[in-house]
Amino acid sequence: MSITNEQILDAVAEMSVMQVVELIEAMEEKFGVTAAAAVVAGGASAEAAAEQTEFDVILTAAGANKVQVIKAVRGATGLGLKEAKGLVDSAPAALKEGVDKAEAEALKAQLEEAGASVEVK
C-alpha cells in the first residue's frame, strides 16, 4: 500500500514547526540536497524583473510646494481635498499601485513638476 501525496501533506500539516525543520534536515541528509540551493538556483529574479508590467507610484516627499503637490495628487487619484492632503502629509505613501509603465512615468513627471519627490517601483 503506497502513501498518496495528500496523505503526506496532511501529515506535514499536523507537525509543529520544529518537527518540519527536523524533517527537512533529514531529507537534506538522506538525499544529499539542500533546501537553500533550490531557492537560490535559477534566474528567477532576473526573469521576474524582465517581466514586470505593473508598477507602484510612491510619493516620497511633498517638497516645498505642498499645495501644488496636493492639487496634482487630487487630479491623478480622484481623491477629495482632505484625502489628498492626508496622503501627501503621510509621505512616503503609495499613490497608485499596479499601473502600467507609461501611466506610472506620466504620473511621476506630473508630480515632480509640482515639486514632489516620487519613486516608481
From Swiss-Prot:
The keyword Kinase does not apply. GO terms for biological process: translation. It comes from the Bacteria. Forms part of the ribosomal stalk which helps the ribosome interact with GTP-bound translation factors. Is thus essential for accurate translation. Belongs to the bacterial ribosomal protein bL12 family. PANTHER family: 39S RIBOSOMAL PROTEIN L12, LARGE RIBOSOMAL SUBUNIT PROTEIN BL12M. This is Large ribosomal subunit protein bL12. It comes from Vibrio atlanticus (strain LGP32) (Vibrio splendidus (strain Mel32)).
